[in-house]
Amino acid sequence: MFVILNSTLKAEWWIGVVMKNYNQHNLVTFSNSILKHFGVKPFHQTEEEVDKVLKGHKKVALVLFDGMGQNIVRKHLKEDSFIRQHYLHTIHSTFPPTTSAATTAFLTAKYPIETGWMSWAQYFDKYKRNIILFKNVDYNTGEKVEPANIANDTIPIKTILELIKENNKDVHAFSVRRYPVDEDGPKTLRQFEKRINKTLKGLDECAIYFYFDSPDYEMHEYGIDNKRVNKIVNKINKIIARVCKKNPDTLFFTFADHGHINVKFLDFCEHEDLYSLLALPMSFEKRTPTFFVKEGKQKEFKELFLKYYGEHFILLSKEEALKDQIFGEGETSEVITNFIGDFVATSIDEYCLYASKEMKKFDLFKGHHAGNTQEEMLIDISAYNV
């Protein structure tokens, strides 16, 4: 459908249809249901299907498997698998559908435009660098950046777990995340299973977030069709069946931050007439890049971008992106909107954009996300011990 539309119609269709659905059922509305259930006033609307199953439950486990979106679950698990048998509801990831934006949105019950956690790497003007938010590393050079917590200091967040604890001291609310996200986190799926069981044992009231970075890691490396991916998704299915059986007093949700697709790469530097119009390095994501353009060159940039990449990418101006709330709704600040360049592009097929002249080292992943396909955006929530 997209290929036969001109660039203006592509953008209008995306805003009118895709983003309308995104802003109604997503990770943010899901986590606002968790807030509401534990007595905290929600920031946004809640997810009705989730509200229903939460009723009466004092112990809630929120288990996120990175990258295991709807397309991955339905590709690798049979209809009678434990996870699919317990399917509850389909929601959208954040835009862009990437871990730093999506997990932060879920953990704060706020949209990326509110938190400022919008992508994998963002340009911090104070430091003149693209910084990977989770790692405090220069995206282009790989160097560790000082001071130690630039993202946390510049765009600090407060999680739903903190809010729940503040509201009710009797509720145990915390996270368990795979090493090295947590220094003492589990390193394998087997350890992850043991940690879930150990954590839940003996608790009366709790809201606990469990995070594991598979199958995202494997799909980046091998693509979404690889046997290794199939094996690990089916292993996850068995683990969930066991922990739910072992903890019948706990309401479990399994879900993802985004899906995954197999990808191809295009080098932005191949078109010097276009690349030379940039004032700063490309930022955000390879499937949803943002561009800071030299003064007075915006019109030329748009024309050339659509000429070379209009078949594969939607292009929006910063003003259009903010007006159409592609990064979500809610209060924002100049600190946050300054991360957005003059233009934002987003992939509508398998292509990624990178700039070879800007990268000291570059990995050509076989699988990726953060673009604008249904496969990347849709997430199935499953619920157990309802």
PLM region spans:
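Feature captures the catalytic ectodomains and active-site-proximal regions of enzymes
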Residues: 2-4, 8-386
